[in-house]
Amino acid sequence: MKKVITTLLSLLLLGSPAIAQRIPVEGWYKMVSAEYGKSWRDSGKRTHFHSIKRFGEVSIFGEGFGFKGKSESEFGLTILDDNLSGSIVARFNWISEKNPLSGFEGHSRCEITAGSTICVMWFDGYGEFEGKILELSLNEKEQIDKENVSGFDLYMLEGLVMDEPSSAIPGGG
C-alpha cells in the first residue's frame, strides 16, 4: 500500500504545473536608439535621469521556443557616477515581429561597473505567449570595443522560458 501511495504522489507532483518545464534560452538585445530626458547631479556628483527611453531589437531562442521582435524600454531609475558605475531599474515591452499583439512585458534591475552592464530581467508573456514567463540575465558583450561603436550597444541574453506557476498569493496573477 505504501508503494501505491508513493507512486500516486509522485505522479501527482510530476504532473503538477508547479513543476513547469524550464527551457534554456539565449539570444541578443541590440540597442538602436535612445531618448534622454532631463538629468541632475546629487551632492555625491552622481547623475540622476528623469527619463530615458531606449529602442532596440531582441532575439531569443531555445529548444522549441523562439522570439524575435522590437524592444521599447523606459528607465525609471538611473544613477551613474563619473566612472559610469551605478544602477538602473527599467520597464520593457518586447513586441513580436510576427504579431504586434504578442510579446513580453517586464522589468529589470541592472548594475553598471565602469560602463559594463549586468542585469537580471523578468518578463510575462501576452498574446500568443500568454502564460509564459522569461527569466533572463543580460551581460554586455565584452568583445565590443566601446571606443569604435557607432549607434548601438549589444548585449547577450541567457536564461529560461517556462509556464507561469500557479499563484499562491491571494489576488496574485
Region roles according to the model:
Residues 6-7, 25:
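Intrinsic disorder/low-complexity segments, especially N-terminal tails and targeting/processing regions
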Residues 1-4:
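Positively charged n-region of N-terminal signal peptides that target proteins for export
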Residues 16-20:
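Sec/Tat signal peptide C-region and signal peptidase I cleavage site
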Residues 21-173:
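Beta-strand-enriched cores of mature, soluble protein domains
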Residues 7-15:
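Bacterial N-terminal signal peptides
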